[in-house]
């Protein structure tokens, strides 16, 4: 498995794949590329779990950046792309999962506060009235933003089941009731 996860990291870091178009270890400001960074952070956390600490400094740097971005907004959703106002609940769940994975690997506690704040925000502001499911997008930029969508909910529940299994189970029960 080590050679496989190593190849995944190499491909994810490649300048033709990463949005910075250069060696990511030389990037000083990760900017508003939360969508790429959330997935890279999960890959790096998975690498550490399987193969060791080769990328731990990059994993830590990205984790801290994602945490800062997430905590800087009252809706606790990081920016996902530089020129897009949309903030997807499922992607924020993936960001929090990536922080939780870093915590699991390194005996840290980066994910606790953002997880608690995000869940509180979601429960207070983003519950679809007729289903109880979380809304798809929190900025209201699309006509379907307030509506739960199947693919988005499945993704959100999958990641949330790691950092808050009880809340994920509630959403899963509602998902099966209203989406299946």
Language-model segments: what does each one mean?
Residues 21-26, 78-84, 134-141:
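Short linear capping/connector segments at secondary-structure termini
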Residues 37-40, 44, 59, 63, ...:
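Hydrophobic core/packing positions within alpha-helical solenoid repeats
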Residues 28-39, 54-57, 109-113, 147, ...:
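Residues within HEAT/ARM-like alpha-solenoid scaffolds
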């Amino acid at each position: 498995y080590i050679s496989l996860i190593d190849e995944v990291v190499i491909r994810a870091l490649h300048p033709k794949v990463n949005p910075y178009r250069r060696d990511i270890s030389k990037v000083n400001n990760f900017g508003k590329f939360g969508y790429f960074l959330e997935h890279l952070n999960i890959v790096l956390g998975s690498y550490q779990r399987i193969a060791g600490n080769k990328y731990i400094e990059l994993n830590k740097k990205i984790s801290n950046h994602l945490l800062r971005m997430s905590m800087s907004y009252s809706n606790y959703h990081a920016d996902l792309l530089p020129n897009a106002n949309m903030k997807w609940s499922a992607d924020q769940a993936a960001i929090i999962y990536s922080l939780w994975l870093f915590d699991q690997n390194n005996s840290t506690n980066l994910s606790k506060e953002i997880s608690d704040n995000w869940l509180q925000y979601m429960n207070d502001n983003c519950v679809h009235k007729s289903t109880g499911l979380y809304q798809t997008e929190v900025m209201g930029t699309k006509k379907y933003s307030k509506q739960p969508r199947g693919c988005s909910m499945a993704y959100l529940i999958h990641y949330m089941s790691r950092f808050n299994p009880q809340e994920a189970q509630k959403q899963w029960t509602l998902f099966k009731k209203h989406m299946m």
